[in-house]
């Protein structure tokens, strides 16, 4: 079983995935790290300081791991595009995402792009199949993990519970060159 933990950068995917790994003993594949380490990309986008993923190579890489593991967690903001059986979409207040990404040293253009993606529900809208959406804003990690475990156990589906558009609409009209 492939479980995708997806969401805009800065929502808490890696933190949540690590706790799930520790509590459930499930193999976690950090998509970003795997793409870099195993050169599963076609090029590096210097402007956005990111890699253009070769999805064919990445899919093959995941398939090989999945042959050995009964269940895997795919941790990454594109994990919902990798044929998961179940998708957890983590959401977070755009202001918190902004702070986290700036702390990580993201360029202003990349910060804005990610804030806009969160406001517009990009990861949620791209997610097809069984989807469970969770707002992580100001929540305890253990509480979030408990909710995820319960959702997976009962194959719960929930989406459309978070809407940042009205409160953060002004971010959608900004542009950084």
Curated annotation (Swiss-Prot):
Region (LID): 103-113
Keywords: ATP-binding, Kinase, Nucleotide-binding, Ribosome biogenesis, rRNA processing, Transferase
A GO molecular-function descriptor: adenylate kinase activity
Signal peptide: none
Region called NMP, residue ranges: 30-53
A single GO BP: rRNA processing
Reaction(s) the record says it catalyses: AMP + ATP = 2 ADP; ATP + H2O = ADP + phosphate + H(+)
Pfam families: AAA_18 (PF13238)
InterPro entries: Adenyl_kinase_AK6, P-loop_NTPase
Sites where the protein binds ATP: 10, 12-15, 104
EC numbers on record: 2.7.4.3
Coiled-coil portions: none
Role played: Broad-specificity nucleoside monophosphate (NMP) kinase that catalyzes the reversible transfer of the terminal phosphate group between nucleoside triphosphates and monophosphates. Also has ATPase activity. Involved in the late maturation steps of the 30S ribosomal particles, specifically 16S rRNA maturation. While NMP activity is not required for ribosome maturation, ATPase activity is. Associates transiently with small ribosomal subunit protein uS11. ATP hydrolysis breaks the interaction with uS11.
Oligomer status and interactors: Interacts with uS11. Not a structural component of 40S pre-ribosomes, but transiently interacts with them by binding to uS11.
The family this protein is said to belong to: Belongs to the adenylate kinase family. AK6 subfamily.
This protein's name: Putative adenylate kinase
